[in-house]
Curated annotation (Swiss-Prot):
Gene name as annotated: rpsG
Stored PROSITE patterns: RIBOSOMAL_S7 (PS00052)
GO terms under cellular component: small ribosomal subunit
NCBIfam families referenced in this protein's UniProt entry, alphabetically: rpsG_bact
Lineage: Bacteria, Pseudomonadati, Pseudomonadota, Betaproteobacteria, Burkholderiales
Protein name, entry field: Small ribosomal subunit protein uS7
GO BP field: translation
Organism: Methylibium petroleiphilum (strain ATCC BAA-1232 / LMG 22953 / PM1)
Amino acid sequence: MPRRREVPKREILPDPKFGNVDLSKFMNVIMESGKKAVAERIIYGALETVEKKANRDPLEVFITALNNVKPMVEVKSRRVGGANYQVPVEVRPVRRMALAMRWLKESARKRSEKSMAQRLANELLEASEGRGGAMKKRDEVHRMAEANKAFSHFRF
């Protein structure tokens, strides 16, 4: 394919209930097979549960959870002289957000509660308090970067 120009980023509209763009992006991450109404029901159900359990603004809990899960550094493989090194690199802001959303979704899926809305609600609550599967994943990525700090001079 020709590489003439940079493809413009799509404008994502804020979600109808809270008017938040990040929540709208998260809805797209949760969505499967183009079923946006189902994803919407899951997310709004989860946020209602969060409000009941935590007695806090659900949007605030969601944003706190996202910010807690965002990774600062990650490792990338780099081949130097016949050996592969795991080189720690800083994560770009857009990727940081995407990874946080993906990890929240994955760790919510792995939970044992009945409905996805309940799983997501509990995962968001735990992540906002610095616990849970998504936080574990973030800490693991940070630990890998810390362990391979010696190779940080092999920058990309």
